[in-house]
Amino acid sequence: MARKKASLDFEQSLADLQALVERLENGELSLEESLAAFEQGIALTRDCQGALAQAEQKVQILLERDGELAAQPFDAEPDV
């Protein structure tokens, strides 16, 4: 259940961040509102980066647990 909650938290943070970016790009916010939105966006970005870093570590741990596989850095870019 904790894994599902963490996933939902990441998805919600990402959705909130996208909504903030749209509001900032519209240019309809006052300076103070823009600064507050920017500050919130920075916090959301850090949360998302932290969640992604944890996911990467879990992938490495899972690879290390299997005796036949060595830990390999997670590469989000597919080999083409």
From Swiss-Prot:
Q: Which UniProt keywords apply?
A: Cytoplasm, Exonuclease, Hydrolase, Nuclease
Keyword check for Zinc-finger, yes or no.
no
Q: Which GO terms describe its molecular function?
A: exodeoxyribonuclease VII activity
Q: What SUPFAM superfamilies does its record include?
A: XseB-like (SSF116842)
Q: Which reaction does it catalyse?
A: Exonucleolytic cleavage in either 5'- to 3'- or 3'- to 5'-direction to yield nucleoside 5'-phosphates
InterPro entries, A to Z? Exonuc_VII_S, Exonuc_VII_ssu_sf
Main localization of the protein?
A: cytoplasm
Stated EC number for the protein is: 3.1.11.6
UniProt-listed GO biological process terms = DNA catabolic process
Specify the domain of life of the species encoding this protein.
Bacteria
What Gene Ontology terms describe where this protein resides (cellular component)?
cytosol; exodeoxyribonuclease VII complex
Compartment(s) where it occurs, according to its Swiss-Prot or TrEMBL record: Cytoplasm
| Family per similarity comment | Belongs to the XseB family.
What the protein does comes down to: Bidirectionally degrades single-stranded DNA into large acid-insoluble oligonucleotides, which are then degraded further into small acid-soluble oligonucleotides.
Q: How does it assemble?
A: Heterooligomer composed of large and small subunits.
Under what name is this protein listed?
Exodeoxyribonuclease 7 small subunit
Question: Taxonomy-wise, where does this protein's organism fall, top ranks first?
Answer: Bacteria, Pseudomonadati, Pseudomonadota, Gammaproteobacteria, Pseudomonadales
